[in-house]
Amino acid sequence: PFHNGHLYHIEKAKELTGADRVIVIMSGDYVQRGTPAVLSKHSRAHMALLNGASVVLELPVCYSCASAEFFAKGAVSVLDGLGCIDALCFGSECGNLEHLTSIAHLLSAEPETYRHHLQSSLKNGMSFPAARCHALEKMTGDAYASQILSDPNNILGIEYLKALKKLNSPIVPFTLKREFS
């Protein structure tokens, strides 16, 4: 359901981007983990419209119930396909676009050294998320970079950035440090 964090995000996104309109993309009747939404999509859309959204679009269920990578790909594809979107503003725990972009570029490029560390970690029984963090830390020598990948909104933000890059989208990314739940 709509909460103070969403209101904060809409207000700060307008301020940060200079936008006078905000398009919100949200899950329909089923959310990312495939569970039914607590409130109907119509109720949630109505709340978003009452609190500053100009338009609410539904993310198709094949994306909304998928991994962060496909969720982001779907959302960015919808926005890019509209042909009139200048900015994408997403929340992240770190709030640092430069760090997120750097990681997104590395994960998109998948250099040989990174792939080697990833495969080695997977063969040693690590889960994919843990192996990815480990490979990133080995590749960059930076524990903070791998720590960024332990937070769900950072992960989603990185996936938005990867999708923008993959689509060669002119949409400019912005991130807000998450202050509310």
Language model features: what each stretch is:
Residues 14-15, 49, 76, 80-81:
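Non-catalytic positions within long, well-ordered alpha-helices that form the structural scaffold/packing
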Residues 20, 54, 86:
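Receiver (REC) domain switch/active-site residues of two-component response regulators
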Residues 1-44:
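N-terminal catalytic cores of NTP/NDP-binding nucleotidyl/phosphoryl-transfer enzymes
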Residues 3, 48, 161:
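Divalent metal-coordination and catalytic microenvironments
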Residues 45-60:
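A glycine-rich helix N-cap at a beta->alpha junction
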